[in-house]
Structures are given as C-alpha cells and as structure tokens.
Amino acid sequence: MLQPARTKYRKMHKGRMPGSAHRGSDMTYGEYGLMSLQPGWITSRQIEAARIAMTRHVKRGGKIWIRIFPDKPITKKPAETRMGTGKGGVEYYVAVVKPGRILYEMEGMTPEVATGALKLAQAKLPVLTKIVKRADLSL
C-alpha cells in the first residue's frame, strides 16, 4: 500500500477542503481518466483496491497511472481509552481529494475496456467520480 517513506512531522491537523482542485485537474498521461466530483479522503487501501480492480479488468493491455498519493496521516486512539493524554498514533494515510481532481489515468486499450475498468474503480472509491476523456477536457 502507498504511504510516505519519510515525513517531516508524524502527525497532522485535520484540515478543511474548501473549493475545487487547481492542481492535478488536467490529464497529462493517459487517454481516459477518473475525475472526482466531491471532496473527501481516499485511503491507501481504497486506492489499491481500485487499482487492482482496474488491472484485472484490463488484463494485459494498456497502462494505468495513479495520480493521487496518500500523504496525510490519520491518527486514532486505542479503544476504551480515557480522553486527554495527547493525540493517538498514526493508523493509516489518506489522499485529500477535491472536486475536479484526476484520480487515475489509462491508455492503450479500447474505449469499452477503459470505461469498464474505470466503472469498477468507481465502485471502490468513497467519493462521486466521473469518467473523462482527454479530448473532452482540452476544449
């Protein structure tokens, strides 16, 4: 699963997600992509589950790019622990996603195979997404 090799600080504030994505909103690698329509956190497990579903559907042909990286640590306190005594330990990592962000890109396959694979990936993700083509975005 994806997670940072080293971080400057172990723990992070929760943060806010106002507005839409400015960075990562253009398709740079593939022909077909998956674009987020709402803000949210996507865990490294969800990113990996969607990637596996896509690669199994595509079988041999094509290439897939993951355009998001889970770099935000999420902490959790142990069960039945009293309040106070500091923040809990890091449990997992998430990628912060805003509307308009491209999550995955694909190329080297027919449109039917690409849309089928991206539909499988949509089912694995906790945010609403839409399938986009490079030709549609470059208007």
Swiss-Prot record:
Residues 7-16 have a biased composition (Basic residues). PROSITE patterns: RIBOSOMAL_L16_1. InterPro entries: Ribosomal_uL16, Ribosomal_uL16_bact-type, Ribosomal_uL16_CS, Ribosomal_uL16_dom, Ribosomal_uL16_sf. GO terms for biological process: translation. Keywords: Ribonucleoprotein, Ribosomal protein, RNA-binding, rRNA-binding, tRNA-binding. Pfam families: Ribosomal_L16 (PF00252). GO terms for cellular component: cytosolic large ribosomal subunit. It comes from the Bacteria. GO terms for molecular function: rRNA binding; structural constituent of ribosome; tRNA binding. Residues 1-23 are annotated as: Disordered. NCBIfam families: rplP_bact. Part of the 50S ribosomal subunit. Belongs to the universal ribosomal protein uL16 family. Binds 23S rRNA and is also seen to make contacts with the A and possibly P site tRNAs. This is Large ribosomal subunit protein uL16. It comes from Myxococcus xanthus (strain DK1622).
